[in-house]
Curated annotation (Swiss-Prot):
Membrane topology note: Peripheral membrane protein
Location relative to the cell: Nucleus; Cytoplasm; Cell membrane
Comp. bias regions, Basic and acidic residues: 108-121
SMART domains, per the entry: PBD
Expressing tissues: Expressed in roots, leaves, guard cells, stems, flowers, siliques and pollen.
Signal peptide positions on this chain: none
Domain CRIB: residue ranges: 36-49
Keywords: Cell membrane, Cytoplasm, Growth regulation, Membrane, Nucleus
Additional detail: Over-expression of RIC7 in tobacco germinating pollen reduces pollen tube elongation.
Role noted for this protein: Functions as a downstream effector of Rho-related GTP binding proteins of the 'Rho of Plants' (ROPs) family. Participates in the propagation of ROP GTPase signals in specific cellular responses. Functions as a downstream effector of active ARAC4/ROP2 GTPase which is involved in the prevention of excessive stomatal opening upon light stimulation. Is involved in pollen tube growth regulation through its interaction with ARAC11/ROP1.
Organism: Arabidopsis thaliana
Originating gene: RIC7
Organism domain of life: Eukaryota
Protein name: CRIB domain-containing protein RIC7
Length: 216
């Protein structure tokens, strides 16, 4: 019984190993079928007949008709020109083909891209605004102080000028009026006396005028 059990176990193990080996063998055969020659020799179907006259023997007949058409020849010429242009651009024409941007656009693009520069610009503007406001305040204060000083200097100069001038004595109008009245009465008395003397022809004076003279 024991021998029968062991033989069945061995058979089952061998069957499993055979199955695994067959699976690996089938996968290996499939890989060998897919690999046709070296990887560098594998060509795409669209490239058939494009590599030169050596492949004309293997190329189909419809490819020859397609090659002989004038449209295909023009396309080939354009392809050669494009390849030459590409080679030039790859080796030496990259920097020449690029348009030169002006400095202002470069600066603006760099400033927009960096947030730190924007913050620094804002702080600079704030400081400049503060500086201008403080300078304006100082200018206003200086102008007001200078105007006050000029007014004070003018007041002091006026006071000194007035102190240096001598005081003019004030004359009473009453005295002038009295003196004017006395002078007028004496003149009138003289005129009347002269008229009296001319009329009478005598040197005597009028009694009224004598009384007036005695009174004065």
């Amino acid at each position: 019984m024991q021998l029968g059990m062991s033989s069945t176990k061995m058979k089952s193990l061998l069957k499993g190993l055979r199955y695994i080996s067959q699976v690996f063998a089938i996968e290996g055969e499939k890989e060998e079928e897919m690999q046709i020659g070296n990887p560098t020799d594998v060509k795409h179907v669209a490239h058939i007949g494009w590599d030169g006259p050596s492949d004309n023997a293997t190329a189909p007949s419809w490819m020859n008709d397609f090659k002989s058409s004038p449209v295909m020849e023009s396309i080939q010429g354009l392809g050669e020109d494009d390849s030459s242009v590409k080679c030039q651009s790859e080796f030496g024409g990259r920097t020449r083909d690029l348009p030169k941007l002006p400095k202002s656009t470069r600066k603006s693009s760099s400033e927009k891209g960096s947030p730190t520069k924007e913050r620094s610009d804002k702080t600079k503007r704030r400081t400049s605004n503060k500086g201008t406001s403080s300078s304006r305040r100082t200018k206003d204060e200086d102008s007001t102080s200078s105007s006050r000083r000029t007014t004070k200097d003018e007041d002091s100069s006026l006071s000194q000028h007035s102190a240096g001038l001598p005081e003019v004595p004030k004359k009473s109008k009453r005295k002038k009026s009295k003196e004017a009245g006395n002078g007028g009465s004496s003149r009138s008395s003289r005129i009347s006396e002269a008229d009296y003397m001319s009329d009478t022809g005598s040197d005597r004076s009028m009694p009224q005028f004598e009384d007036d003279r005695n009174g004065f």
